[in-house]
Amino acid sequence: MFKIEYNVSRNSTSVRRGQFYLNAFQLKKECNNYVVSKNKNTFFRDMILKMQQTIKFKDNMKSINDDYIYLKNNYCHSYGIKNKNFCSFDYFIFSKLFIIKKTSSFSNLFVLPKISEFFVQKKCLFIGLNKSKYTNFSLGHNISSWFYDDKLCCLFSILNFLADTSLNSIFSLNRKRYYSIIYSLDRDKIFKFGKIYKLFDIFKKKFILSCDYKFWKKFVFKKMLVFLNNKTKCITFILNSKHLGSVFIYFKIINNKSIILDLVTCRNEIKKIFQSHIIYLKNVLKDCGIEVSSINVSSREEFLNAVRTNYDRKFDSKILNHYNTVISKTKSHALRFYELDKNDYQYNYNNINMYV
């Protein structure tokens, strides 16, 4: 039997605790049979009922151990889950994990700590978390399982780029260390940018953590914006840090095979760290099958000068010029995704469609 402990936060002051038990053998053998403890908590009873017709063990998945369970089309309430001692087994893969309750303009994506992978299945993105040496969370190990087909990519393990304090700041529901990733994504809008295997996972494990961890622990991003330009197949991340300023990360996918990567920062110390690791990062990416056309590290002014005459990148330079204004318009939300209208290259807030 597997024991699962949890905390459920219904508001800032009320916390409900409980536990339930699942029998792994029955989960594998019969998808409609569940073993739940006699002390059935309402929260998990409802969750189990919603899962009842959809839970499934997938035998053809690459099994890490006997407790490797595949949960398909699960639905559950959008309450936070406490990280400490969450479950006794380590490996889950979730597919189509959506949340019923929505908060403001976001759909809360219910994420369990200690999940070691995330998996893309048609119209959603799943983030897997597990403990690592340097931070409480690390995204993904078996990167090949991220992709539903060759046309998909998982650039959003950019979260690996963040230190533990950053994750706490951005993704805590009520600042009491209840974790829930705050977005779900539509594949048709997001995953049009080719196939990239380990880019951001490498950013953390091979790139960021090779630097001084005490330095990066200050890297607390209060806001993160993601802009998608469908016409040019470009993705732009803007990360804003109270201590270290803003970091602008720009990707252009070329023929679904190679990438151009620009790292733009206003702080010289960040620029120097990036520059000192460019060759190493490029070699690691190449070993993973990602052909990097170029990796450029520059200041804000250098980047603007470089793209000033490039029509395809005018929008990206406009974002960089106005990111402070954009960030101020996101109110209290930490993460939002934007898509530029396909026919509009003028920077106009009315033509930016927020779809998360």
From Swiss-Prot:
Record bears the keyword Lipid biosynthesis: no
GO BP terms in the entry: bacterial-type flagellum organization
Domain-related comment: Two-domain protein with the central portion of the sequence acting as a hinge or connector between the two.
Function summary: Controls the length of the flagellar hook.
Protein family: Belongs to the FliK family.
A Pfam family: Flg_hook
Annotated organism of origin: Buchnera aphidicola subsp. Baizongia pistaciae (strain Bp)
Entry keyword annotation includes Transport: no
Protein name as catalogued: Flagellar hook-length control protein
Highest taxon of source: Bacteria
Keyword list, A-Z: Bacterial flagellum biogenesis
